[in-house]
Amino acid sequence: MEKGARQRNNTAKNHPGSDTSPEAEASSGGGGVALKKEIGLVSACGIIVGNIIGSGIFVSPKGVLENAGSVGLALIVWIVTGIITAVGALCYAELGVTIPKSGGDYSYVKDIFGGLAGFLRLWIAVLVIYPTNQAVIALTFSNYVLQPLFPTCFPPESGLRLLAAICLLLLTWVNCSSVRWATRVQDIFTAGKLLALALIIIMGIVQICKGEFFWLEPKNAFENFQEPDIGLVALAFLQGSFAYGGWNFLNYVTEELVDPYKNLPRAIFISIPLVTFVYVFANIAYVTAMSPQELLASNAVAVTFGEKLLGVMAWIMPISVALSTFGGVNGSLFTSSRLFFAGAREGHLPSVLAMIHVKRCTPIPALLFTCLSTLLMLVTSDMYTLINYVGFINYLFYGVTVAGQIVLRWKKPDIPRPIKVSLLFPIIYLLFWAFLLIFSLWSEPVVCGIGLAIMLTGVPVYFLGVYWQHKPKCFNDFIKSLTLVSQKMCVVVYPQEGNSGAEETTDDLEEQHKPIFKPTPVKDPDSEEQP
């Protein structure tokens, strides 16, 4: 096993953007292991759609309506935010094939702006964003499963958290067992939630055919039920943008895509318009059966919709929400574990997280780390508060990443770009992003300030854990022993990869401060010890 741990130093040093297939290298060399390219176009679409469409469209699409002030303006907000999301996704598509590494915006920010910027993106994701989001989705799943058993009261809190933990453990086992199993689960549950939403849309069309379209007539659709306010409209756009969250998750698994140069942009072209269509027409369907006041008063819009129109079949809606959230947990586990895997590979997280199973070729340590951090969030009571604090930071890094696309065009105009979008796209996205960011700072300065403070706690961690390379020998020996024990327990080794630079787990000092992605291999300091 020690030999497996050392094989990262014997792998060929290749450019991160190399197009060599990992399977080809593994089979042609010495039998090394590597991440497998098992995600086809259908599964890629399932990852995007499954991560965007969670429980929100079923449970609480009222956030946009409440702030927009009218049905018509709310529908416009859903359409515009869908278009802006598509624009941002196209920018990420260019970055994804220019810097074809797993890790998504973390990898892009690190390669373009340097190690500290990338680490801060990773730090906030590891510390709060993914553990809290996954915990909330799992709790939503358990709530909709248990609610029918407690028709006259709320399910017990301990029962909710226990079932959420079981959900997380089950899906972690699936993801550890096989990439193919994980993507099949994602495909099935994404199809299920789309079928449920298709049912809602079809019923809305039936309602329109019956003449139930009072709130869709222009004079009624734009009738304000509150005083128009530009600040509230901005909040509506912010709520809409959050509803499309997850559109960038496919970039986290770029190295496992079959033919990423084709399938990454294709999946984006298919998925984002599909989600926009579903969101807009689901909201149209809702207002054919409910007035804006009824919609705003409902705690679970799809359930209320089902009770009004489905009669004895109303049970379909809560089951649909449960299935949707179950698939959402799976998709988030799958993609976030690849983010942590990529961070460990770059030396920003413990190196054991950059290892994969010798037979299954799944990043088991990263998956277990993701699961454990989420389980810890389940036993805390302040995770919703944490989400509010760091939601602003998460959105901040979307803009930083897209700005990096412009910087990369300027600094490295000649590097290969299989996809090259018009510069108008990142400019449009950044203008929209700046509008929302400035308004967020103005309307909730304390919340945004706390979010920034949480992110900046990563600065001393970076300098102590990453920048400071000459640590005491006793510390290095302890980490090496801990890594070896973890490696034996999980039966994992460092992967041999020819397309991602996965064999490097630390950066040298010079590379840490380079602001722009350089298409030359990074020299692994450990390799200097080899004869």
UniProtKB/Swiss-Prot annotation:
Modified sites of kind Phosphoserine: 18, 21, 27-28, 527
Record topological domains on the Cytoplasmic side: 1-43, 95-115, 178-180, 252-264, 338-363, 408-422, 466-531
Keyword vocabulary terms for this entry: Amino-acid transport, Antiport, Cell membrane, Disulfide bond, Membrane, Phosphoprotein, Transmembrane, Transmembrane helix, Transport
Tissue/organ expression: Strongly expressed in kidney and small intestine. Moderately present in placenta, ovary and brain. Expressed in the inner ear.
Membrane topology classification: Multi-pass membrane protein
Bias (Polar residues): 7-21
Reaction(s) the record says it catalyses: L-histidine(in) + L-phenylalanine(out) = L-histidine(out) + L-phenylalanine(in); L-tryptophan(in) + L-phenylalanine(out) = L-tryptophan(out) + L-phenylalanine(in); L-isoleucine(in) + L-phenylalanine(out) = L-isoleucine(out) + L-phenylalanine(in); L-valine(in) + L-phenylalanine(out) = L-valine(out) + L-phenylalanine(in)
GO BP terms: amino acid transport; glycine transport; L-alanine import across plasma membrane; L-amino acid transport; L-leucine import across plasma membrane; L-leucine transport; proline transmembrane transport; thyroid hormone transport
Protein location: Cell membrane; Basolateral cell membrane
Consequence of gene loss (knockout): Slc7a8-deficient mice present normal development and growth. Only a slightly altered coordination of movements is observed in Slc7a8-deficient mice. Circulating thyroid hormones, thyrotropin and thyroid hormone-responsive genes remain unchange. Functional compensation by other amino acid transporters might explain the lack of a severe phenotype. The lack of Slc7a8 results in a significant increase of cataracts in old animals, in particularly in old females.
Binding residue positions for L-leucine: 52, 245
GO cellular component terms attached to this protein's record: apical plasma membrane; basolateral plasma membrane; microvillus membrane; plasma membrane
UniProt keyword Phosphoprotein present: yes
One GO MF term attached to the UniProt entry: L-amino acid transmembrane transporter activity
Sites marked Important for substrate specificity: 133, 245
Binding-site positions, L-tryptophan: 133, 394
Extracellular side: 65-72, 149-156, 210-229, 287-311, 382-385
Membrane-spanning residues: 44-64, 73-94, 116-148, 157-177, 181-209, 230-251, 265-286, 312-337, 364-381, 386-407, 423-445, 446-465
Family affiliation: Belongs to the amino acid-polyamine-organocation (APC) superfamily. L-type amino acid transporter (LAT) (TC 2.A.3.8) family.
Subunit text: Disulfide-linked heterodimer composed of the catalytic light chain subunit SLC7A8 and the heavy chain subunit SLC3A2. SLC3A2 acts as a chaperone for correct plasma membrane trafficking and stabilization of SLC7A8 and modulates the substrate affinity and specificity of SLC7A8. ICAM-1 associates with the heterodimer SLC3A2/SLC7A8; facilitates leucine uptake.
Task performed by this protein: Associates with SLC3A2 to form a functional heterodimeric complex that translocates small and large neutral amino acids with broad specificity and a stoichiometry of 1:1. Functions as amino acid antiporter mediating the influx of extracellular essential amino acids mainly in exchange with the efflux of highly concentrated intracellular amino acids. Has relatively symmetrical selectivities but strongly asymmetrical substrate affinities at both the intracellular and extracellular sides of the transporter.
Protein name per Swiss-Prot or TrEMBL: Large neutral amino acids transporter small subunit 2
Native source species: Mus musculus
